[in-house]
Amino acid sequence: LEYVCVLTELGKVCGGFGLSVAAHNSLCIGHILQHGNEAQKNKYLPALASGEHIGAWGLTEPNTGSDAMRMQCVAKKEGNEWVINGLKTWITHALSADVYVILVRTGDLLDSNGISAFIIEKGTPGLSANKITQKVGVRASETAELYFDNVRVPAENLIGEEGKGFKQAMKVLDGGRISIAALSLGVAKGAYEASVAYAKEREQFGKPIAQFQAISFKLADMATECEAAELLCMQAADMKNKGMNIT
């Protein structure tokens, strides 16, 4: 519930910054917290939670967004390491992250048990990124393509069991949907507050336009929808806190 309130307030003033906070917490930290072992949690979470380190989470590829089981980024086991090759895109913090949680294919194409999650550290040889600059909005949130060229990852950086990454990702995204809903609520509330302020300032026919019924109706509708959205966000957050299914 507190997290929803924080993201809502951030969304009022800067959707891009709020999105960065959501990606860091809901996705990267959330994945390790929910599915990592104790050694992984102890190694990575303190610096991520304090803000000393920035986290990124990678699922999307150029031709696989919602259709994640068609991903082409592949990891092959070689001794005590996994070797990753491929490309991810639209990855928040891909350039600045210290820690990455990446979903890759370790089994057959279209097999939901053929995807695994790995923790990759900044500076790992073969890992590089290219910033995406042509964005319509949320430009304060860094977005980039992430390249893997024979990136070697220790076997202990596998999160959970091999082949369970897809199921892990779906659970992580459940919580992520609440954070994006809260962020969107903040954007809406910010727009509403700006609209009210302008309606009180702008004058026509000798009085503020807020006093005209047609304008008041629109503002009332906006306020009603914001209130309804806030209640739904809070309900979803409360259900998640109780361990209930929210999707």
Give short role names for the model-derived ranges:
Residues 12, 127-228:
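Glycine-rich beta->alpha junctions and the first turn(s) of the following alpha-helix
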